[in-house]
Amino acid sequence: MQVILLDKVANLGSLGDQVNVKAGYARNFLVPQGKAVPATKKNVEFFEARRAELEAKLADVLTAAEARATKIKELGSVTIASKAGDEGKLFGSIGTRDIADAVTAAGVDIAKSEVRLPNGVLRTIGEHVVSFQVHSDVFAELNVVVVAEA
């Protein structure tokens, strides 16, 4: 199925590309999320007329994401208190939701889906480097300090 991309899609293309994808991927993911439209004659003409507007909108989103990434980097570190045993192991773990809540409380709005934990959830006290993907092209890193609750 031919579609026109309205946004940058990983491993597929960027704004304005006409790509061939499986029908189910287009119907169930790309079109409902507003990332693509079917490549009919009418849609191709409509897209070409609005191309500059869509590119400007995409640039604005990228600029906003870069500003959020800068705010995250300016935080330096975020401290999270959790119950822990004597050897420094946590009772439970600290996951993406806990980190997103702590960063949001520190003043930068972050969704839990933007938090990236490549080594899995945090299970020990100490400093951990956590990365955030605020846009498909924009990443930020932040130190998360896990301390034992008194």
UniProtKB/Swiss-Prot annotation:
It comes from the Bacteria. SUPFAM superfamilies: L9 N-domain-like, Ribosomal protein L9 C-domain. GO terms for cellular component: ribonucleoprotein complex; ribosome. Binds to the 23S rRNA. The keyword Ribonucleoprotein applies. HAMAP family: Ribosomal_bL9. GO terms for molecular function: rRNA binding; structural constituent of ribosome. This is Large ribosomal subunit protein bL9. It comes from Pectobacterium atrosepticum (strain SCRI 1043 / ATCC BAA-672) (Erwinia carotovora subsp. atroseptica). Pfam families: Ribosomal_L9_C, Ribosomal_L9_N. Keywords: Ribonucleoprotein, Ribosomal protein, RNA-binding, rRNA-binding. Belongs to the bacterial ribosomal protein bL9 family. One of its GO terms (biological process) is translation.
